[in-house]
């Protein structure tokens, strides 16, 4: 039987081709036999190395004892006792081969062909996560006595993990919580629970004032800074930190109180003590059944109908000056045309733009949620919906024109679910204190979060007494941190237009097809009483108005603890807010711009709009 085929090595093949010697005879084989070494169940009679490896090419008869004891998969693993050996550059698996001790290992080739074996699980590598695996192989006798002997491998085990005993840091020695609760402790805990449970509390004793209303709760803690950017959204977030209750169970939501004196029973306490209310809405502390609640609401309706009165005129003894009477009669004579007919106004674009300006001021400076608003010069209630968007809790409107106040109250009654309580009074707020007309629960000092005067404050600068009374009414009822907002004619711009008139012009009139302004004198001594006649198409019919000296106004406000925080002309407000997230879309929603982005105002209306400016003061 012929011997099995000998592996072909690179060096031997080269020698056979270059010289014809003993190697040629040694490498000769029969072409009729082709047997694989794996088919013979016996060891080979001569040493062998893996064909194609670097070690086999350089040393064809080298022998590694580990080749017979380790499996081919783990043949590249070396023990901790072996010296490092060069790796094969042609083997993709990174296996290692032991060279004869008498031979010098060939250096590994450098360059792109140099192979760096990947990290495998070897006994010498402590970071390995796999244990060595042995495969039994037939034992062979080494052909060379100089071959190093293989030391049996002993698996290396890592040190056991360190065990940390549970020993937490204690403030005190551990003790048991299983201790008896004595009867006196139980009684004490029940007493505390009863005192803290609003469902078990008895109604608080009512303190009646001369008007029959209950004394209100103190005003909430004032804000120490201006509203933040998150508070400026004209459409506030739909959340509230108070318990949700049906509006009809919190306070009576019927027609507003529009006269001074005792309010209906539903307003027995104002401002309502929201913190003392229970989720059921029984804000007097009692817990009646469903029938009792229905009967209570019916009684409130009956009592309101008995006590309902029309909006009163000026209080007894209140004297109006001649010019104030002219202003009141003018606005009383203006009919309420409604939203539908208003669209046919020749200055509808200007009116919508002014409403947008007021929406910006309210959206930027309204206190949320559940703010309290004092509207001086409320007119016909044109801003009720704007304040509704701000989710206020209380609205008090005052105006010198009693017919306008009546129309404002009617507008509030027609509002579907206004969400706030409203009170309306006819009163000259620039000549008399508000305490002459407000009910006691509404004239608490520092009660209101916002005071607003839209297109009316300039009437107060007829003289120093009226201007100081106006500032006093604002400062007295505006809480610390509250904001006073308003819109007035730009006196500096009006004086510039007046000075542009030629000296020979004795009429002192300027304007356009939309408005006209006529001064009574070119030069005026003092900062009060510089009057002019103002006409605006379909709005103002030749009414006396007064310039507001801005520096004097800021000085008066500073004396009353009001600090200026905002001042911009109308065109500046438009340029600043037209692209804002909150107020830019309102230009289209409120009709200032049409679907094509075109303004409803013509050039004359735009000139009239730029005569005004907006402001905001914070009470310090």
Curated annotation (Swiss-Prot):
Molecular functions (GO terms): mRNA 5'-cap (guanine-N7-)-methyltransferase activity; RNA binding
Polar residues bias spans: 29-44
Location(s) in or outside the cell: Nucleus
Region of interest: Disordered: 1-176, 193-304
Main location: nucleus
Low complexity bias (residue ranges): 45-60, 136-157
InterPro entries xref list: mRNA_G-N7_MeTrfase_dom, RG7MT1, SAM-dependent_MTases_sf
GO BP term, pick one: 7-methylguanosine mRNA capping
Gene Ontology terms: cellular component: nucleus
Start and end residues of each mRNA cap 0 methyltransferase domain: 345-620
Pfam family, one: mRNA_G-N7_MeTrfase
Positions that bind mRNA: 354-355
Binding positions for S-adenosyl-L-methionine per the UniProt entry: 358, 377, 399, 428, 454, 459
Site keyed mRNA cap binding: positions: 380, 386, 411, 458, 545, 612
Catalyzed chemical reaction(s): a 5'-end (5'-triphosphoguanosine)-ribonucleoside in mRNA + S-adenosyl-L-methionine = a 5'-end (N(7)-methyl 5'-triphosphoguanosine)-ribonucleoside in mRNA + S-adenosyl-L-homocysteine
PROSITE patterns attached to this UniProt entry: RNA_CAP0_MT
Listed EC numbers: 2.1.1.56
Signal peptide bounds: none
Keyword NADP: no
Keywords: Methyltransferase, mRNA capping, mRNA processing, Nucleus, RNA-binding, S-adenosyl-L-methionine, Transferase
Family to which this protein belongs: Belongs to the class I-like SAM-binding methyltransferase superfamily. mRNA cap 0 methyltransferase family.
Function description: Responsible for methylating the 5'-cap structure of mRNAs.
Official protein name in the record: mRNA cap guanine-N(7) methyltransferase
């Amino acid at each position: 039987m012929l011997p099995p085929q000998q592996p072909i090595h690179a060096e031997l093949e080269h020698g056979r081709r270059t010289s014809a010697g003993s190697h040629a005879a040694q490498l000769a084989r029969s072409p009729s036999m082709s047997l694989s070494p794996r088919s013979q169940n016996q060891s080979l009679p001569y040493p062998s190395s893996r064909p194609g490896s670097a070690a086999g090419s350089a040393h064809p008869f080298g022998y590694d004892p580990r080749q017979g004891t380790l499996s081919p998969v783990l043949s590249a693993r070396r023990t901790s006792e072996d010296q490092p050996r060069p790796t094969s550059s042609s083997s993709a698996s990174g296996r290692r081969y032991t060279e004869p001790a008498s031979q010098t290992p060939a250096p590994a080739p450098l360059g792109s062909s140099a192979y760096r074996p990947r990290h495998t699980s070897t006994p010498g590598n402590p970071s390995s996560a796999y244990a060595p695996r042995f495969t039994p192989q037939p034992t062979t006798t080494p052909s060379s006595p100089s071959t190093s002997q293989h030391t049996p491998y002993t698996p290396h085990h890592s040190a056991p993990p360190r065990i940390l005993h549970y020993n937490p840091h204690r403030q005190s020695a551990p003790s048991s919580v299983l201790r008896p609760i004595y009867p006196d402790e139980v009684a004490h805990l029940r007493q505390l629970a009863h005192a803290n449970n609003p469902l078990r509390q008895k109604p608080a004793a009512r303190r009646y004032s001369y008007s029959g209303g209950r004394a209100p709760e103190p005003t909430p803690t004032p804000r120490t800074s201006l509203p933040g950017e998150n508070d400026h959204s004209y459409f506030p977030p739909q959340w509230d930190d108070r318990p949700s209750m049906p509006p009809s169970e919190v306070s009576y939501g019927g027609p507003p109180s529009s006269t001074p004196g005792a309010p209906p029973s539903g307003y027995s306490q104002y401002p309502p003590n929201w913190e003392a209310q229970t989720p059921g809405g029984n804000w007097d502390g009692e817990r009646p059944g469903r029938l009792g609640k229905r009967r209570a609401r019916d009684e409130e309706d009956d009592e309101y109908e008995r006590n309902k009165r029309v909006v009163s005129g000026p209080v007894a003894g209140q004297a109006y000056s001649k010019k104030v009477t002219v202003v009141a009669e003018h606005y009383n004579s203006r009919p309420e045309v409604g939203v539908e007919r208003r669209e046919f106004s020749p200055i509808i674009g200007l009116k919508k733009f002014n409403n947008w300006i007021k929406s910006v001021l309210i959206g930027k400076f309204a206190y949320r949620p559940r703010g309290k608003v004092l509207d001086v010069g409320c007119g016909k209630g044109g801003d009720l919906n704007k304040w509704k968007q701000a989710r206020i809790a209380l609205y008090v409107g005052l105006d010198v024109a009693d017919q306008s106040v009546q129309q404002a109250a009617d507008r509030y009654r027609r509002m579907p679910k206004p969400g706030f309580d409203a009170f309306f009074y006819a009163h000259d707020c620039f000549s008399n204190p508000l305490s002459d007309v407000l009910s006691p629960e509404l004239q608490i000092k520092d009660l209101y979060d916002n005071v607003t005067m839209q297109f009316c404050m300039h009437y107060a600068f007829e003289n120093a007494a009226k201007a100081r009374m106006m500032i006093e009414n604002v400062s007295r009822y505006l809480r610390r941190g509250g904001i006073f907002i308003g819109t007035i004619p730009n006196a500096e711009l009006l004086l510039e237009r007046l000075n542009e008139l030629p000296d020979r012009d004795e009429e002192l009139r300027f304007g356009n097809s939309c408005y006209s302004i006529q001064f009574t004198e070119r030069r005026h001594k003092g900062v009060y009483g510089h009057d002019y006649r103002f006409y605006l198409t379909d709005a103002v019919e030749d009414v006396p108005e007064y310039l507001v000296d801005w520096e004097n106004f800021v000085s008066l406000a500073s004396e009353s603890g009001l600090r200026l925080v905002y001042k911009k002309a109308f065109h500046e407000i438009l340029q600043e807010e037209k692209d804002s997230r909150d107020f830019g879309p309102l230009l289209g929603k409120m009709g200032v711009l049409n679907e094509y982005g075109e303004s409803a105002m013509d050039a004359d209306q735009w000139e009239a709009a730029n005569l005004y400016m907006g402001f905001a003061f914070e009470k310090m």
